Amino acid sequence: MAIQYKRILLKVSGEALSGPKGTGFDEETIASICAGIKAAHDLGAQIGIVVGGGNFWRGRSSGKMDRMDADKIGMLATVMNALAVKDALRQQGVEAVVMTSSLMPQVAECFTSDKAIAALESGKIVVFGGGTGNPIFSTDTASALRALEISADAMFKATMVDGVYDKDPHKYADAVRYDTLTFTRVLDERLAVMDSTAATLCRDNGLPILVFDLGKPENIAKAVQGEMVGTLVKE
């Protein structure tokens, strides 16, 4: 079956891995998400994944803690999530490897673009942990960076809503969903797609983003085939 996006970077929030529990891991939820990833992989897509850490830690809500230390804790949380996703994929018969932004030789391989691309081309899914390896930068920015480093055709941002809206659809019944947007409009209107650093990276390097609902894991395979399952952002 023909696919539109041969190589993708999938961003999955940490909160998505917690399922109805709201914190930590929910094995059933992770298994469901990974089944959706496997379906896209079975179509022939090469898949890199960046996971957030919000199911364990949110640096911006860390009170009086030093921001640098808080962000480092958050980066470690993403490594835990990356290992959980890798294990869930392997349970479903998919070869996967974790690559981290900082040296953790007893935990995972350290990321280089060459090693990541080689793993993708060999049929493995690569799960990236540790964010960018630097404090301040979000996992959205890490996703944009890794997508560019592996020469992805698109970045898929799997969220808890079915696209980008003009206002919060959970609060406003008259919220309007966009089918397509430009990065310039996203930045000018501060629409809730991702932070401005990540959006600017994608805009300046011609990397499209598809935002869709991870509550329907089958959307990943549909999106790989070019179906409009959410909001497409490109310049």
Task: Please tell me what each predicted stretch does.
Residues 1-235:
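C-terminal catalytic "cap/lid" subdomain
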